[in-house]
Amino acid sequence: MFSRVFLVFLIFIFPLAYGEDLRTIKPERVGMSSERLAKIKPHMQRYVDEGKVAGIQTIIARNGKIVHFEQVGTLNLDTGSEMKHDSLFRIASMTKPVATTAAMILFEEGKLLLDDPVDKYLPAFKDKKVLVDGELVDATHPFTIRELMSHTGGLTYGIFGNSPIDQQYREAMFGENNTFNFRNIANNDTPESQLKTLDDLVAAIGPIPLQYQPGTQWVYSLSVDILGAVIEKVSGQPLDTFMEERLFQPLGMKDTFFEVPKDKLNRFGTLHTIDQTGKLIVVDRPETSDFANNVSFLSAGGGLVSTASDYIRYAQMMLNGGELNGVRILSPTTIDLMTRNQLTYDQQLKYDPRPGIAGTTGFGLGFGLKTEAPKTASGSKGNFRWAGIFGTDFWCDPKENLTAILLMQMIPYPQNVRAEFKNLTYQAITEMN
């Protein structure tokens, strides 16, 4: 069984009308083609037929109406149960935008400022040092809430690189002489995390030097997990309680949680990888998953389980400028702030250096952004998105009033499927805004 903390590091009573699903309509009513959208399902089926994934689910909404919702393949490889509209997925780092949105609720209430130093709320991060060319130097400034949200505060993840700071993170998470290696995933042989709560995380990495001076680089990191600890401190509530009361209930997200309830386990699938022989195998099972058994580590960076129907409500709220079905979560001005680029041009080039993409992609508060229309891919300037390590992905296109979600449970996932799904979505548009 995978450790829950390992999985999430990879990588988050109202009136009945609030819980209603977004209405499904004929695509032609919102400038899309039914015939062209029909290309998506057989394309995804090929991935299943070739044994590259167990199952895939896709959902698309335009102008606030669902125009496509399909799934192919198997939810649970052990039982053979099929994927359905209400299937539950480990959404991994798609948790990050949701948690950042929760923090912005506190921002709007005047309970925190984006330029507040993190050590104002979490003293373990006071007086940080930075490791520069093997020497410890003082940080130029305390890293801030904004730098947590934009992954520019000097933190790292510890599991994607091999710098001296990465090594210290791994020791803090998995112990000295740990055997962590992504190649071990296929053998279901990953080390157990020592960290059981957000407080454990803060205490463990608080003393570790920063990897770079705050504000100078973009490095994907545990920042949003630390933001989760800030949310708990400022709100005075556990992270799951705050997010349930302030986000999930108001938006009608009845199937989004950090721990899968026992009565919903039959809708929660297996997690998969490809073993050394090329065979699709199970590496996490619903009945033994740490996403379903006495969850104590509430990972704002990757701990949520959700459905396509729930997550598209969140995405549509963001696309609507902070409101869904008459329920306002945030002001349009706050959504605008969250989707502004926080990176310098040099940081953008390092953030996504791919040919044709470099310099057109930035990062806001919780989201990757398109600062320019891409030259080699579908999409519009102003798109915002994020994804997860198990093959989950979503994006919002304000120009075309379009949002789409791709869900699977695969590590590693097929690299091209996200771009292919995006192209298949945009080719179905017949009337541009």
Regions found by a protein language model. Give the residues of each.
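Short, conserved phosphate/pyrophosphate- and ester-handling motifs at nucleotide-, phospho-/glycolipid
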Residues: 33, 96, 307
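Hydrophobic h-region of N-terminal signal peptides that target proteins for export
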Residues: 10-18
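Sec-dependent signal peptide recognition
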Residues: 2-8
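Active-site SXXK
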Residues: 38-44, 64-66, 89-118, 224-232, ...
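A generic structural motif
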Residues: 73-74, 287, 410
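Short, conserved catalytic-motif segment at the N-terminal edge
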Residues: 21-91, 111-113, 126-135, 415, ...
